[in-house]
């Protein structure tokens, strides 16, 4: 992320829950007043989600992480869809993609996350079974290529040597 006078070019976020409009919950699971789990909170993700020119969300594709609606709005995606984001005055363009171990979700015209790509060995049925809403496929859904040995080396040795993400 590069920032100058709140001009954030690109941000990478994660969260405990991501809903069908790319909203992120990193605050509580369950009712706010009596949560099942209290989480760390925004930690700056709210500002990144609201102001970044481009924002990408990275998370494992698990049913518990992909409810139809988040329990709490920590960071704004496309809120309730449509022009809700613009109506609230949130400047950034919203999440460009949600990257998971199964595939890549991208917003459609309404701001709803749809399956834009599947990774090798993964199926739409597998993605749907791990998503809490009726997941749609993008009209031009593609299949990602397996990484080359050199790409894996760079990821494992240079970008993520402690294996936090891979």
Stretches with model-predicted labels:
Residues 4-136, 147:
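Conserved phosphate- and dinucleotide-binding cores of soluble alpha/beta proteins
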Residues 134, 138-166:
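A conserved C-terminal secondary-structure "cap"
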